[in-house]
Amino acid sequence: MMKFDHLSIPVNDVGRSREWYTATLGLRVEFEVLDRRSVALQDSEGFAIFLQEVPSEVDPNGCALWFQVADVDATFADWSARGVVFALGPQKSFWGYGVELVDPDGYRIRLWDERTMREK
C-alpha cells in the first residue's frame, strides 16, 4: 500500500504563511515544530502541507497547489465576500474550470471542481 501523505514547501516567513493558509484556505494546524520554524497544515481529507521557513529567498518556480472544492463559483462568491483576493476569477483554462490565488511566497493556489469543469 502506498498513500501520498504530505507535501513540503519552503516559505520565507512561516508565521505569515501559517496565517494565510489557515485564514484563507481554512486548513487546520496539525502540528508545529517551533525550533525548526515549521508547521504542518491539514485539509478536511487528511492531506497535509508542511511549511518550513528557509533562510534564503523562496522561488516558487512554477509550483501550483490544487484544491478540489464542491462548487468553484460558490466558493469564489463566499471567499470574495470574506475579503479573499483572487489572482484569477472563475474561468475556463487549459486545465479546466476554476480560480487562482497566490500565497505570500508566490505559490499559485488553484481551486477547481469536477462538475463545473465538465459543464463549462
Model-derived features: positions:
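N-terminal beta-strand motif that seeds the catalytic metal site of vicinal oxygen chelate
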Residues: M1-R18, G46, C63-L65, R115-K120
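Vicinal oxygen chelate
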Residues: F4-N12, V39-Q42, S56-K120
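Amphipathic alpha-helical segments
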Residues: G15-R28
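Short glycine/proline-centered loop/turn elements that form peptide/ligand docking sites
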Residues: R16, V33-S38, F94, M117-E119
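Short secondary-structure junctions
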Residues: G26-E32, F86-G89
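Conserved short beta-strand elements that form part of the metal-binding/catalytic scaffold
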Residues: R28-C63, I109-E114
